[in-house]
């Protein structure tokens, strides 16, 4: 099973995988139905979640109902419990919109919601994050998760995120983070997908961020809070929702 997961993730193009997953969802939900684990995004329960991982396979990672991963479920709980995202009138820009959130966010009456990506079939706007066709100070809230590790000129991308966010606005920019490393590891001479997979953990990544990631965000102007939200949750909740053991949510304010 684990080898099959690796093959599927590394061989099938992401756009095609997104479409296939929606077709297979009803069958998967029936097969895994149970009460042990709950997806907080839609409150569906299952006897187990699906395994996931490009290299190291994680058990109970992918929800069969929303296709949320551990980090998505943690972010959902954070937004629900710690912010006014679901109640305040705000204008939201969502980069590389995750299927786990898309339909839920579209139905929220309090937000004006736009999605953006260069390639995603789920996006409303097709655009390069380094050259956004958007006026400055346009959005109250920006979600841009697991995007920056794909961008060669991440400083330019961060500057664009800062530019289109309103003063006082909030951005959440999660990335794969190696908390053991102070410095980010990047080598732009590595272009072969297999070599990138070895070096950066995924075939289309161009770096592994270290703890200096937050300094990069601060350099372009953001005030950054490193929110370790799992520390606020009980062990029972972490098991119930299949949450990451360690995850920092970068909450960035302009």
Where on the chain are the PLM-derived regions?
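Long, charged N-terminal interaction/targeting segments
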Residues: 1-7, 141, 168
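Conserved N-terminal segment of class I S-adenosyl-L-methionine
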Residues: 2-135, 228, 232-253
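S-adenosyl-L-methionine-dependent methyltransferase catalytic module, highlighting the catalytic core
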Residues: 25-37, 152-166, 170-253
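Hydrophobic beta-strand segment of the Class I
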Residues: 95, 139-143
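An acidic- and aromatic-residue-enriched active-site/binding cleft used to recognize and process polar
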Residues: 118, 144, 176-178
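Short catalytic micro-motifs in class I SAM-dependent methyltransferases
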Residues: 146-150
């Amino acid at each position: 099973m684990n080898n099959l997961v690796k093959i599927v993730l590394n061989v099938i193009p992401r756009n095609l995988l997104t479409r296939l997953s929606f077709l297979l969802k009803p069958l998967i939900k029936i097969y895994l139905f149970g009460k042990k684990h709950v997806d907080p995004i839609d409150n569906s329960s299952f006897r187990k979640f699906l395994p996931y991982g490009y290299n190291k396979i994680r058990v109970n990672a992918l929800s069969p109902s929303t296709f949320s991963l551990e980090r998505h479920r943690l972010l959902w709980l954070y937004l629900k419990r710690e912010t006014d995202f679901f109640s305040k009138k705000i204008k939201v820009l969502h980069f590389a919109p995750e299927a786990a959130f898309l339909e839920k966010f579209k139905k929220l009456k309090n937000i004006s919601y736009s999605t953006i990506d260069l390639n995603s079939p789920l996006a409303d706007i097709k655009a390069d994050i380094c050259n956004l066709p958007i006026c400055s100070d346009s959005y109250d809230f920006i979600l841009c998760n697991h995007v920056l590790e794909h961008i060669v000129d991440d400083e330019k991308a961060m500057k664009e995120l800062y530019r289109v966010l309103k003063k006082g606005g909030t951005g959440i920019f999660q990335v794969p983070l190696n908390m053991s490393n102070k410095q980010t590891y990047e080598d732009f001479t590595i272009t072969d997908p297999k070599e990138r997979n070895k070096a950066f953990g995924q075939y289309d990544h161009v770096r592994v961020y270290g703890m200096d990631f937050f300094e990069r965000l601060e350099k372009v102007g953001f005030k950054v809070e490193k929110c370790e939200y799992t520390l606020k949750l009980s062990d029972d909740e972490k098991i119930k929702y299949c949450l990451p053991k360690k995850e920092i949510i970068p909450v960035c304010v302009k």
